[in-house]
Amino acid sequence: METHRLKSIIILTLLLMNVFLLGTLGIRQAQQAAARRQATEELVKLFAAEGVTLSEAAVTFDPPPQALTLERDSGAEKTAAAVFLGDELTAADEGGGILTYTSALGRAVFRASGAFEIVGELGKAPADLVRRFCRSYECESPDEWLDASGSGSVTVNRLCRGYPVEGGTVTFLSENNVLRSVSGTFLPLHSTAAQGEGLLTASTALTSFLEARRTSGAVVSAVKGLSPCYELQNTASTLTLTPLWRVDTDAVDYYVNCVTGAVDHA
């Protein structure tokens, strides 16, 4: 009997602890939501004082992406070339960071800067080929881009971990339902986080943008959106993706560097 009572007391105690923890969590979430609402209202007022309308929907409290370092991967480049040129490839090192792959179907050139170009008869059903490539190599999926003859060209943005890469695109060209060329920026699939602390939050990026606008005298009357993205930078052997906040305005788009705080426009 005493054992049964003891078990009941323990169960009741655990239930009360769970209720307490849930209540504490609910209070914290409510406090956080209230603090975010207040911060948003203050930002809107700050912009209004400068004659700029800031959409509340543009204010986000999500963290920016991490800075990334991408090491060149010649194996991944060869695999990408094989998508269009087949597996029977002849590889050559042309020097200066240039690697080439050739087959009976065409030729692929990859550079240390991340630039690449593949030309030849790269396959029929170009729309399907392009969709598969974009799915495998993190590119935005294009809308309809071919005319009735199966000809046309389209340029899509590169992505990394789901974020757009400014300065990174891939262009596809088709003639008479045959894909003829693929060119643009090739990003290795594997990356290393280079920096994860001290990056500018969205609210800090917005205030940095507002200060830069005031200093430059730029004519901007409304901020319509704010979104994270990457900027592609390259050296002789390393590609770097620097996180940015993109500020969409009624004039031009601006970019705030999450590492340095520098503000630039498109």
Protein language model features and the residues they cover:
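Preferential activation on post-signal-peptide N-terminal prodomains/segments
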Residues: 1-144
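Generic hydrophobic secondary-structure signal
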Residues: 10, 14-17, 170, 179-182, ...
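Exposed beta-strand-loop-beta-strand "reactive/processing" segments of non-cytosolic proteins
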Residues: 78-102, 112, 118-119, 136-176, ...
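Long, charged/polar, surface-exposed segments that mediate recognition or autoinhibition
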Residues: 114-222
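Extracytoplasmic/luminal low-complexity segments enriched in Pro/Gly and acidic/polar residues
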Residues: 191-266
